[in-house]
């Protein structure tokens, strides 16, 4: 990103293809060192990465070293993601994500009986690099892989394991009711008993077993 561009680094990052799930973290939140406690131990090139996020002038050595600049860019993306995971647990962050949720920016539940229920991003781990972002349906309370492949490489730690639950704790009025309908397997119009498959499996197993001769 060139220095002649007026758009901030945060707006640029959130506008990238594949980063649609992110909201723009307020710079005031990032500038409060208390909110960044411990992140310097998780992110390499922490100081330079933070300066990049806040659009501060980079060191001259960094401008003259393209390889180092790429490393700082990667570190800035990681740092922003970890800050983002904390920010969306605050009232301001929840408000921004709630707006995206209401607009369906995160997609809709593929389950038929959830009737196009909007979903929320969630991480299966709070540790970076362990799992990619998933989508949580508050109606069936299950998680799904994002439909678009461009979201398959977004780290789940940048949203955290508790975000959807925090949102509904703060705004319980947006929590949907559980699905009224449940799919019922049928064969020739009759409901299939839960034990039917097990009994059929046992019967097939007995049929395949060799008959023992009694002497």
Curated annotation (Swiss-Prot):
| Motif annotated as KSSR motif, chain positions | 147-150
Q: N-acetylserine (modified residue): where? A: 2
Q: Where does Zn(2+) bind?
A: 109, 114, 137, 140
Cell compartment(s), UniProt: Nucleus
* Molecular-function annotations in GO: chromatin binding; identical protein binding; metal ion binding; protein domain specific binding; protein kinase regulator activity; protein serine/threonine kinase activity; protein-macromolecule adaptor activity; RNA polymerase II-specific DNA-binding transcription factor binding
What GO terms fall under cellular component here?
chromatin; cytoplasm; cytosol; extracellular exosome; extracellular region; fibrillar center; ficolin-1-rich granule lumen; nucleoplasm
Residue ranges of the region described as Interaction with alpha subunit: 188-193
Q: So what does this one do?
A: Regulatory subunit of casein kinase II/CK2. As part of the kinase complex regulates the basal catalytic activity of the alpha subunit a constitutively active serine/threonine-protein kinase that phosphorylates a large number of substrates containing acidic residues C-terminal to the phosphorylated serine or threonine. Participates in Wnt signaling. (Microbial infection) Upon infection with Epstein-Barr virus (EBV), the interaction with viral EBNA1 increases the association of CK2 with PML proteins, which increases PML phosphorylation by CK2, triggering the polyubiquitylation and degradation of PML. Seems to also suppress EBV reactivation by mediating ARK2N and JUN at the Z promoter which inhibits BZLF1 transcrition.
Domain-related comment: The KSSR motif is part of a protein interaction pocket that mediates interaction with cellular and viral proteins.
Q: For the modification Phosphoserine, which residues carry it?
A: 2-3, 8, 69, 209
Provide the record's note on post-translational modification. Phosphorylated by alpha subunit.
For this entry, list what GO says about its biological process. Answer: adiponectin-activated signaling pathway; endothelial tube morphogenesis; negative regulation of blood vessel endothelial cell migration; negative regulation of cell population proliferation; negative regulation of proteasomal ubiquitin-dependent protein catabolic process; negative regulation of viral life cycle; peptidyl-threonine phosphorylation; positive regulation of activin receptor signaling pathway
Provide the assembly information: Casein kinase II/CK2 is a tetramer composed of an alpha subunit, an alpha' subunit and two beta subunits. The beta subunit dimerization is mediated by zinc ions. Interacts with DYNLT2. Interacts with CD163. Also a component of a CK2-SPT16-SSRP1 complex composed of SSRP1, SUPT16H, CSNK2A1, CSNK2A2 and CSNK2B, the complex associating following UV irradiation. Interacts with MUSK; mediates phosphorylation of MUSK by CK2. Interacts with FGF1; this interaction is increased in the presence of FIBP, suggesting a possible cooperative interaction between CSNKB and FIBP in binding to FGF1. (Microbial infection) Interacts (via KSSR motif) with Epstein-Barr virus EBNA1; the interaction requires phosphorylation of EBNA1, is independent and simultaneous to EBNA1 interaction with USP7 as well as necessary for PML nuclear bodies disruption by EBNA1. EBNA1, USP7 and CSNK2B form a ternary complex.
Q: What is its main location?
A: nucleus
Q: Which residues carry this modification: N6-acetyllysine?
A: 212
This one is known as Casein kinase II subunit beta
Any Pfam family = CK_II_beta
Q: Which domain of life is it from?
A: Eukaryota
Q: Which UniProt keywords apply?
A: Acetylation, Disease variant, Epilepsy, Intellectual disability, Isopeptide bond, Metal-binding, Nucleus, Phosphoprotein, Ubl conjugation, Wnt signaling pathway, Zinc
